[in-house]
């Protein structure tokens, strides 16, 4: 029989204890846990170093309230890792005559990069995308083609550059110069593309805010799939989707959802007739819409965390390019049908148009005021009114000025008497000593200086009265300007109408629909839903 040779690894395996025979740790959870793998221990102690990178660059994680409320035990040494010898003071003295170790001297030397001026070294890091990598023949490409830039280093540099850029606009003068530079850059003619030098512009058009449609709030609605009906396609489907409406609804259990309504055949004919006759709607007609789909929604607006500004452009031939704001972003996902819950597949939306009420017109004027500046004519009228008020109040100021002069003369008399008393005190202090003389003289000078600079109590009261009058005049001018702007808003009423409405009053998922849904809607129509 041939001898059996046992290696060192086999010997060690034979003496190892069987690790998977140990009993698992008893869990403190009553229910059965599907994944019972315990987390590993932290390999090192906390370092208390600020993390300069964005925490959401790899994955967006939101901690729960249970994690936020948990307090981790921080176990540290009593001396915090710093051992101090309080008995022998010579422990921390450094001998200047001691020579460093050669290894330490190399660590203190500055790294000098060798110049890479040779042509061969410049070609090492060159990457040719259209050429096949010869991995089986040579590893030269793999050795020289690897980039030396690490992502952490690149991100750190970008963070540092971001901090330096933010410091540029801290000063007021730098902000003014930066704003003026934008006007100068806008005057320069565009001769070529900013990144493609061979691309030249065919037509240059100015970009302005959309003053016509800015009064209507717009929302971006994103569907998870094509909402077009299955039985139609092409131009007919696009025509139906252009006339579609979305409304917030509630099922029997009280769960809210978004209903997607498409126009019926009769409504499509009425809309086509309105378009041919160049009118928005017929006042007495009723437009019917049938429910097509049900969605759950997720809304983000300006009040939501992580909101990003979004704009869209409108090209008008012969006029220019205009941009408008998308202040709400809505994501719609298909709603699953629940067993035992009656679906609203037979719901019918009946729409009848009306004129806008005062509240809706005020909301439009408020949005319009975001873009428009005050007209110079109104400013001149305000200035004339303020001048008339100042002229009318000048007589009262003169009377108050004469009374303040009388009070000032009385204050001067009292000041002279106080000076005499101070002189008597100075004579008495001369007898007491030289140090007391100097202190009393300083106090007398301080009192006189205070009276000359700040005046008496009567003067301060007159100043307070005059300040109150100035504030009253300023308030009056503000009220006049507000009334003038309101009148202008009523004169410039807009009869434009939008066919979209928003049932999304808040930024959270499945938020409760309240009266704010009508305020957020830009539609000038009344909608009633009936279920068969």
From Swiss-Prot:
GO terms for molecular function: chromatin binding; RNA polymerase II complex binding. Residues 352-401 form a coiled coil. GO terms for cellular component: Cdc73/Paf1 complex; cytoplasm; fibrillar center; membrane. Its main location: nucleus. InterPro entries: RNA_pol_II-assoc_Paf1. Residues 499-508 have a biased composition (Low complexity). Residues 361-374, 389-434, 442-453 have a biased composition (Basic and acidic residues). It is found in: Nucleus. Residues 375-388, 458-469 have a biased composition (Acidic residues). There is a cross-link at residues 133, 154 (Glycyl lysine isopeptide (Lys-Gly) (interchain with G-Cter in SUMO2)). It comes from the Eukaryota. Keywords: Coiled coil, Isopeptide bond, Nucleus, Phosphoprotein, Transcription, Transcription regulation, Ubl conjugation, Wnt signaling pathway. Residues 1-23, 361-532 are annotated as: Disordered. Component of the PAF1 complex (PAF1C) which has multiple functions during transcription by RNA polymerase II and is implicated in regulation of development and maintenance of embryonic stem cell pluripotency. PAF1C associates with RNA polymerase II through interaction with POLR2A CTD non-phosphorylated and 'Ser-2'- and 'Ser-5'-phosphorylated forms and is involved in transcriptional elongation, acting both independently and synergistically with TCEA1 and in cooperation with the DSIF complex and HTATSF1. PAF1C is required for transcription of Hox and Wnt target genes. Belongs to the PAF1 family. Component of the PAF1 complex, which consists of CDC73, PAF1, LEO1, CTR9, RTF1 and SKIC8. The PAF1 complex interacts with PHF5A. Interacts with POLR2A, TCEA1, SKIC3, KMT2A/MLL1, SUPT5H, RNF20 and RNF40. Interacts with UBE2E1. This is RNA polymerase II-associated factor 1 homolog.
